[in-house]
């Protein structure tokens, strides 16, 4: 076991060294003349939230260049790298700042909404397949708040990203939990409609994750803009 722990520490040091080598120019100006900050994100966050706000985050006129790195694992952080990760925060050896709160609410396509009627009971939703965003935790939490217990059905489906879950719901595959405000723009574009008024807080949130210690001015600017965009999305 000791050798395994030593191996993990060695791998972490190698990962950090490679990140520092890759970022050897730090947030220095490149050929485009802008400070570059690399942001590690999961693909669904890049699609649903970060990319639509990229121009605003880079400034007007642009004074930052944001390079997204799609990664499902915790990437090595440096003077030129931050990450945005979903969870409860409090990760060791890093600084994590929550970006926005999320509310979970059931949404479906128009056909299912019509079949359910204008005022369905929470139990009525269980007649349809439930669509999960990566795990069953969201639906378990929502149903518990309605005094119901989640029992998995063979027709339920799990998708690896929130964007995919919403697309599946829009195609009529079942009912998904929209994560508001995170996926609000997407479910509006897809024509999804609410099928129950109850909104339950999501215990997980996206966090801005940076390494401990002083931060480069470009990273500070980006964090301030991320927080500003987050406030606007919740307004």
Identify the function of each model-found stretch.
Residues 34-92:
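Central regulatory/effector-binding core of bacterial HTH transcription factors
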Residues 38-40, 83, 107, 131, ...:
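Short, well-ordered beta-strand segments
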Residues 197-235:
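A late-sequence structural motif
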Residues 2-30:
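Alpha-helical "hinge/linker" immediately C-terminal to small N-terminal DNA-binding modules
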Residues 30-37, 124-126:
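Immediate post-signal peptide segment of exported/extracytoplasmic ligand-binding proteins
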Residues 15, 25, 43, 47-59, ...:
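Amphipathic alpha-helical segments that line or abut small-molecule/effector binding pockets
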Residues 77, 89-173, 178, 182-203, ...:
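C-terminal regulatory
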């Amino acid at each position: 076991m000791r050798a395994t722990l030593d191996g993990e520490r060695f791998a972490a040091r190698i990962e950090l060294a490679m990140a520092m080598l890759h970022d050897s120019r730090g947030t220095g100006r490149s050929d485009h003349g802008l400070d570059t900050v690399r942001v590690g994100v999961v693909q669904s966050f890049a699609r649903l939230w970060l990319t639509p706000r990229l121009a605003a985050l880079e400034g007007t006129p642009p004074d930052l260049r944001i390079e997204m790195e799609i990664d499902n694992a915790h990437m090595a952080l440096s003077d030129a790298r931050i990450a945005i990760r979903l969870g409860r925060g409090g990760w060791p050896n890093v600084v994590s700042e929550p970006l926005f709160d999320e509310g979970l609410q059931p949404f479906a396509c128009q056909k299912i909404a019509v079949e359910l009627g204008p005022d369905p009971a929470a139990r009525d939703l269980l007649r349809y397949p439930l669509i999960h965003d990566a795990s069953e935790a969201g639906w378990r939490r929502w149903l518990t708040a309605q005094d119901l217990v989640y029992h998995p059905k063979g027709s339920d489906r799990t998708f690896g990203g929130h964007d995919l879950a919403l697309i599946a719901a829009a195609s009529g595959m079942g009912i998904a939990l929209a994560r508001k405000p995170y996926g609000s723009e997407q479910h509006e574009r897809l024509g999804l409609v609410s099928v129950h008024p109850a909104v339950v807080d999501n215990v997980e949130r996206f966090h801005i994750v940076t390494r401990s210690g002083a931060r480069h001015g470009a990273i500070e600017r980006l964090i301030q803009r991320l927080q500003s965009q987050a406030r606007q999305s919740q307004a």
